A protein has these predicted regions:
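Bacterial N-terminal signal peptides that target proteins for export
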Residues: 2-11
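Bacterial N-terminal signal peptides
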Residues: 10-20
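N-terminal leader/targeting pre-sequences
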Residues: 24-203
């Protein structure tokens, strides 16, 4: 029975790799894959693309993100997320990506971006309330939860105004440092919700 289950799991992973040609694994263990345009940005940014390479480096991973086909000279916010589309689940702010005059941006992030990427809250504890004037104010207490694996990526406009300037919807979302970002632009919904690309990176 165990051998059968082990074989089935291996076959499932192999099938996933065959069916998703956007993911490639190199001899050095690095994994390369694409991000796709989010549903809310498909009409206004149909040519937006993202390309990600994650390279294991001992105790951490190095993640290089290249985005193109975006508005020029614009700031975007990059997150590791539980699922690629709404409601997104647990989300972890990584940093910003700024585009140049040609709508292209690149940033390198160093951290834990692999099958071991997770968040956990063993218990509730008071949290500082710093940003509390917007539509998504800080919570003053966290809910406890067991480990949640987070294997997807998402990119958001840094502000609703920037999104509207690009002809996109002006919805306000919490995905920036002040919790008043614009809509999601790119994500990894080309992978299953429970098998995001980070799951295929092994430290």
């Amino acid at each position: 029975m165990f051998k059968h289950l082990q074989f089935s799991a291996t076959a499932a992973v192999s099938l996933l790799l065959v069916l998703n040609p956007l993911l490639a694994t190199a001899k050095d263990g690095s994994v390369t894959f694409d991000m796709v345009v989010s549903g809310g940005a498909r009409a206004c940014l149909p040519n937006a693309t993202g390309h990600v390479t994650i390279t294991p480096a001992g105790p951490v991973e190095i993640m290089d993100v290249v985005v193109e086909g975006l508005p020029p000279n614009t700031e975007f916010d990059f997150f590791v997320i539980q699922v690629p589309k709404a409601p997104f689940g647990v989300s972890w702010y990584q940093g910003d990506i700024e585009t140049n005059a040609h709508g292209r941006g690149h940033e390198r992030f160093v951290g834990r971006f692999s099958i071991e990427t997770f968040a956990v809250a063993p218990g509730s504890a008071p949290a500082p309330v710093v940003f509390n004037n917007g539509p998504f104010p800080d919570a003053s207490l966290n809910p406890p939860f067991n480990p949640i694996q987070m294997y997807h990526l998402g990119l958001w406009f840094g502000s609703p105004q920037a999104a509207q300037a690009a002809g996109c919807p002006g919805n306000v979302t919490p995905f920036n440092g002040d919790h008043n970002a614009g809509i999601q632009v790119l994500n990894t919904s080309n992978f299953p919700d429970d098998f995001g690309p980070l799951r295929q990176v092994h430290p």
